[in-house]
Design a protein with these regions (language model features):
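N-terminal secretory signal peptides and thylakoid transit peptides that target proteins
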Residues: 2-20
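Non-catalytic accessory segments flanking enzyme active sites
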Residues: 61-139
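C-terminal segment of N-terminal export signals and the immediately downstream linker at the start
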Residues: 5, 27-54
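Mobile cap/lid helix-loop segments that gate and shape the active-site cleft of serine hydrolases
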Residues: 249-264, 268-277, 315-356, 374-384, ...
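Alpha/beta-hydrolase fold nucleophile elbow
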Residues: 287-296
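Proline/glycine-enriched tight loop/beta-turn segments at coil->beta junctions
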Residues: 131-133, 142-150, 157
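Cap/lid segment of the alpha/beta-hydrolase catalytic domain
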Residues: 154-272, 330-331
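C-terminal catalytic histidine-bearing segment of alpha/beta-hydrolase fold enzymes
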Residues: 339, 385-386, 390-429
């Protein structure tokens, strides 16, 4: 990775346009003012500056992890047996994630059903032990005969917590204009969960922790942190939604601190949400619970990586636009990412991509974009090298695939075609 990264206005705006940089959006303020003002940040960092996100502490922080494999990395010479390694590693990673425990599948209710373009779309809801009820779309092709392979389709983050499942589904009803443009920008205009269902899958798209039906409501938090913002009215104007999303981006800092203080982590909580969704999917009468997979872009790619690494039920997984290394985040890219990524002490145990390999030899695919400014291209390639190395060492090199596509952060039609082919290879054989 280049050690002398350049921060400049063009680079920063490209981050912000992806909707990840949250607290660094120009003009973004929070109760009491935001000390991390984006405009000031840009003015203080010219195109010729050689800086990092934590100043004079950067060199020291970068040296802590170095290039050596983590203590539980399968790259270590001491690990040779895949089963023994992952049994030990999973116990430790579960401990670090500190996920809320949900002991049984909650009661699931069907609250709506539509048919659109050859796909049945049922709206489901269930109540977890924490937070508001979860809503999800369950999609199946019409005239199903026999049990189908099931895929957990994981929506992205996109700095848009007002929406979740609607980002990748079209249920045949009028779509909000923001969701139409979202699909056009990131998914070639496609509701890819629908496209996958058409190809013979049962697809579940759940709102995860803090998104759409699971979002934090302003009425439920103290006025001192509302920053004059109110919950979105039924008219759902773009202005109201964007205002809520700016507030929610800043609220991530509070949420992360509170979760750490409670003894859990943000990845641990969304993983618990998604594991329950996987249980719901596997319990449906239309689904073959022995053929389950997952796929997602960006924040959905992170979710795919986590549940694909931590849950043995996932037989095939695709991570799109969310693969790099911890080293990439230390100095240059942590500010472009959500708190959903970070687990204290995990980098000591293994590198970021190795989480995705925790269920080896289960097949895993990574899709990257060469102009994705959320990560350093060199570190995306290094993550690919790490995953190739561990799958090769385990004796299953054919069970891992990585592809690089031209262009910015996206999961476009060409990438969808490749992802769907990968899922078909492993879930329909």
């Amino acid at each position: 990775m280049e050690k002398n990264k350049k921060f400049n206005r063009r680079r920063f705006i490209s981050y912000s346009s992806l909707g990840i940089a949250g607290a660094f959006w120009p003009g973004n303020t929070f109760a009491g003012g935001n000390p991390f003002d984006a405009d000031a940040f840009l003015q203080d960092n010219s195109a010729d500056s050689e800086t990092n996100l934590i100043g004079s502490y950067g060199k020291w922080a970068d040296s802590l992890s170095g290039d050596k494999p983590g203590r539980l990395s399968f790259r270590n010479p001491g690990f040779t047996d895949v089963h023994a390694w992952k049994t030990r590693a999973l116990v430790r990673i579960e401990e670090l994630l500190a996920s809320p425990v949900v002991n049984k599948i909650p009661e699931v209710r069907e609250i709506d059903e539509t048919v659109h373009d050859g796909v049945s779309i049922k709206k489901l809801t269930w109540q977890l032990p924490y937070g508001p009820p979860t809503e999800a779309f369950f999609l199946t092709p019409l005239n199903v005969k026999g049990k189908l392979p099931g895929v957990l389709a994981l929506h992205d983050h996109g700095a848009n917590k007002y929406f979740g499942k609607q980002k990748i589904v079209n249920n045949g009803k009028e779509q909000h204009p923001m969701m139409v443009s979202h699909k056009e920008e990131y998914y070639s205009g496609k509701a890819w969960a629908n496209e996958l269902a058409k190809q013979g899958y049962a697809v579940l798209v759940n709102d995860t922790f803090t998104f759409e039906s699971r979002k934090v409501l302003l009425k439920d938090v103290p006025s001192v942190i509302r920053a004059g913002v109110s919950d979105v009215s039924p008219k759902e104007s773009r202005e109201e939604i964007e205002q809520y999303n700016r507030w929610a981006a800043n609220h991530e800092h509070i949420m992360a601190k509170s979760l750490f203080s409670a003894g859990t982590t943000w990845p641990g909580v969304f993983l618990s949400d998604d594991r329950v969704a996987l249980s719901v999917l596997g319990s449906r009468k239309e689904v073959d619970s022995d053929r389950l997979g997952c796929c997602g872009l960006s924040g959905g790619g992170l979710r795919s990586m986590m549940i694909g690494g931590m849950d043995e039920r996932i037989k095939a997984a695709v991570c799109v636009g969310m693969m790099s290394t911890w080293r990439d985040l230390v100095l240059y890219h942590s500010f472009t990412h959500t708190w959903m990524m970070f687990v204290p002490h995990l980098p000591v145990e293994m590198d970021y991509p190795e989480i995705f390999a925790l269920q080896m030899p289960a097949p895993r695919m990574v899709l990257n974009n060469t102009e994705d400014t959320l990560f350093d291209l060199g570190e995306m390639k290094r993550a690919d090298t790490i995953l190739k190395e561990v799958y090769q060492k385990a004796g299953f090199p054919e069970n891992y695939m990585c592809e690089f596509y031209p262009g910015p952060h996206k999961f476009d039609a060409a990438m969808q075609k490749s992802a769907f082919s990968w899922l078909e290879r492993w879930l329909k054989k």
